[in-house]
Amino acid sequence: MKVAIVGASGAVGQEFLRILAERDFPMDELVLFGSERSAGRKYSFKGKDYEVRLLQHNDDFKDVDIAFVSAGGGTSKEYADTITKHGAVMIDNSSAFRMDDDVPLVVPECNAEDALKRPRGIIANPNCTTIMMVVVLQPL
């Protein structure tokens, strides 16, 4: 499995890397993307260094299976088609798609099955306050 992280140099991108390593997420390949300001930076993941590539409208996502995206709503909207056009599943952490009927809002503890219903190839999450609330309310 090939995994991409968009917004890799930001706080959430770094947290994605930490959690993927901590959980020993099964992947064969990792690719990091960022802005012009971040491109060229190097980050270590499981003992290997990875260089951040410039996010562009091209075919860099052709063989990507999952893209974790946390680069802001504008970037998510602008690059959604670029990321998903070859079949990658985009898991978006921004507010860009929270009102889009074709993008499921998924909180795994509550509605994990909705992640399978993704007509646009995108899964989004609700905002942090909503996530905490639905996790508590779900058993009721």
For the regions a language model picked out, list residue spans one by one.
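N-terminal Rossmann-like NAD(P) cofactor-binding subdomain of oxidoreductases
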Residues: 1-139
